[in-house]
Every structure is written in C-alpha cells, then in structure tokens.
A protein has these predicted regions:
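His/Asp/Glu-rich mid-to-C-terminal helical/loop segments that flank catalytic regions of hydrolases
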Residues: 59, 273-323
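Zn-dependent metallopeptidase/amidohydrolase metal-coordination segment
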Residues: 245-292
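Second-shell loop/turn segments in exported
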Residues: 51-61, 89-90, 128-139, 166-167, ...
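Metal-dependent peptidase/peptidase-like ectodomains
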Residues: 167-265
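N-terminal capping segment at the start of a domain
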Residues: 36-65, 77, 273-279
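Bacterial Sec-dependent N-terminal signal peptides
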Residues: 1-36
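A non-catalytic alpha/beta surface segment that caps or lines the substrate-entry region
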Residues: 56-106
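Alpha-helical metal-binding/catalytic segments enriched in His/Glu/Asp
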Residues: 103, 115, 121, 126-173, ...
C-alpha cells in the first residue's frame, strides 16, 4: 500500500466512524423523543386527580370538565372523531347527562386495536378533613396510559387503525361503556376492532414486580400469549391471580365482550395489599410514576410491532357471551 493510499484509507475509516457515531446519536435521540416522559404521565394524573376535579363523579361539572380535558388531549394528537363532529359522545342515565370520549387514528388496515380506561370516580364525602376521592390509580392511571399511547403513535404509520376511548360512569355500574357499546352509530368503528386493551389501575407495582401487569380473563383467549410473544424490554403480562373474583365480567371490557370483541382489562393492582381502593388516599402520592411510565412505553413499543398477521387473538369455547 502506498503512503497516499494509506492516508486515503485512514481518512475513509475516520469519516465512517464519525458518520456511524452521528447516526447512532441521532437514532438514539429520535428513539428517546418518541417515549412518553414521566413528567407527562404525572401531569395527566395530577390534572384528573386534582382536588379541583372533586373526585370526577358522574353528573357533576367536574366530571364534564374531565371529559373535556381528555377530548383536548385527543385533539392535540390529531385523532379523528369516532362519530359526528366531536370527541365527546353524550348519553343519559337516570335523568343525568354525561359524556364518553372517543377518537380514532387511521392505519393501513380498517381493522383496529382499541385502548380504553374509565375517567369517572366516586366524588367526595361529608367528613371533616380530606374528603375528596381523587382516584389517581382508579382510574386516572388508566387514562394516562390511553393518552400516552395516543401521544406515542401521533406521528407513526401503523398497520392497525387505533381507537382511543375514555368511559364515564364506570363506578355506578359500567354505564358509560355500555352506552357507547350500544350506540349503533358507532357500529362501523366497533365492527372493525380486533382487540380491546382496557387499562384499569396501573399506578402501583403489581405482585409480580416492576414492568409487569396481569390480564383478566386470560383463560378465555390467547390475547396474553400473543402480547408476551411480541413484548419488548421485559414487559410481562401475567395470568389473573384473582380469578375467583370474576374481574373479567366486572370491568368496562365486558360490554365489548357482549359484542364478541376480544376485550380484556389490564392492571397492576395488588388486591391483597392495596389500601387505597375507593379511599381518600388514592391520590398522586400513591403513584409509582417511574414504573407506570415504563409500562406505558413498553406497551407502546410492543403494540408498534403488532399487525394484522402476527396479532389476531381469538376467544376459546370457555367464554360466556350471555350474562
């Protein structure tokens, strides 16, 4: 090799090293920028679970304000309307009017994945001192997951279309999700849902540890197996450890099960240890924000891998549609 050739080789090697370093740094920055920050998650929960929201009880101005806040977040993420010209879909229950919230992101396929959580809680009590049931875990944490997923996929091209829903009046009998599921104007949306992820109480560490959730009704479909097969960064969906409590039939997912849509609830709550369920200490201080943020980002990256070929969950013959 001549001296000139040697210099040329050295220069090319140096340039390639610098180029590779540049690409690595930029790809790392881009990847990091796609993630939902802990500050963002805390902000969403703090807004919904603030004292000003007075427990978000159905039929109150604060409940309406919560729905409007979620709708504004859907708008920021450029979601389309599920029906009509608003994210807010009204319904009535015993003479009181409320709103569910629904937005849609179009993908390459008409088939969709749906993500949901309920935003209402149980209001206040008449006792002295702290009398507000803030509902940070139940279920502002689930709403933060739905909004976080909308954030993550805002500028991404996905195979599946995506439906984002926030249900009202869960605490008084799953009323809001039933009203939405029974709304015939939404049949064109619901008829294309391949699977629904209903997020319910994710603010605390599960009995399985960090970065781990459990899924209700795992015995009825292969939903969890398919998620675990595609899971990233150690995310793990465990079987329901509380099957005797029939949680599958006691959360908003059930109103979509009735429509024979694959619909499961996902949670981290340790029901053997939790002392904040429907208690005034269910506030921002109960939230393990780092773990929740990690779960949201890992679900987002896992869902990003899903398409109409590698994720088509099905019910087995154990599920009961008539109840």
């Amino acid at each position: 090799m001549t001296y000139q050739s040697y210099l040329c080789f050295i220069n090319k090697s140096t340039i390639m090293k610098k180029l590779n370093l540049f690409l690595f740094i930029n790809l790392s920055i881009f990847s990091f920028a796609q993630e939902i920050s802990k500050e963002r998650v805390v902000n969403i929960i703090s807004t919904l679970a603030s004292d000003e929201m007075k427990g978000r009880k159905f039929g109150t101005p604060e409940n309406d304000k919560s729905a409007e806040y979620i709708a504004s977040e859907f708008k920021k993420n450029n979601l389309g309307y599920c029906v009509g010209d608003s994210y807010l879909i009204p319904f009535e229950h015993k003479g009181q009017k409320g709103f569910n919230v629904c937005g849609i992101k179009k993908g390459k396929s008409e088939k969709s994945l749906a993500f949901s959580a309920h935003f209402d809680h149980i209001g206040t009590n008449n006792k002295a001192g702290d009398n507000i049931y803030n509902g940070a875990d139940d279920d502002a944490s689930g709403v933060s997951t739905v909004i976080g997923l909308a954030d993550y996929f805002k500028d991404k091209k996905t195979d599946y279309s995506m439906v984002f829903m926030a249900f009202n009046a869960e605490e008084i009998g799953l009323i809001g999700s039933k009203a939405l599921a029974d709304n015939e104007k939404l049949n064109p949306v619901f008829n294309n849902i391949s699977a629904l992820f209903n997020f319910e109480m994710l603010a605390t560490e599960s009995q399985f540890g960090k970065n781990a959730v459990f899924m209700t009704g795992d015995e009825f479909s292969d939903f969890d197996e398919l998620i675990n097969a595609n899971a990233v960064n150690g995310l793990k969906v465990h079987s329901d450890p509380y099957q005797g409590q029939q949680l599958f039939y006691r959360s908003d997912n059930v109103n979509f099960v009735k429509k024979k849509i694959i619909a499961h609830s996902i949670s981290t709550v340790d029901m053997n240890k939790a002392t904040h369920y429907h208690a005034v200490n269910d506030d921002i201080n109960i939230v393990d924000a780092e773990n929740l943020t990690n779960i949201i980002n890992n679900f987002a990256k896992t869902i990003e891998k899903l398409n109409t070929k590698n994720f088509t969950p099905k019910y087995n013959d154990k599920v009961n549609f008539d109840f």
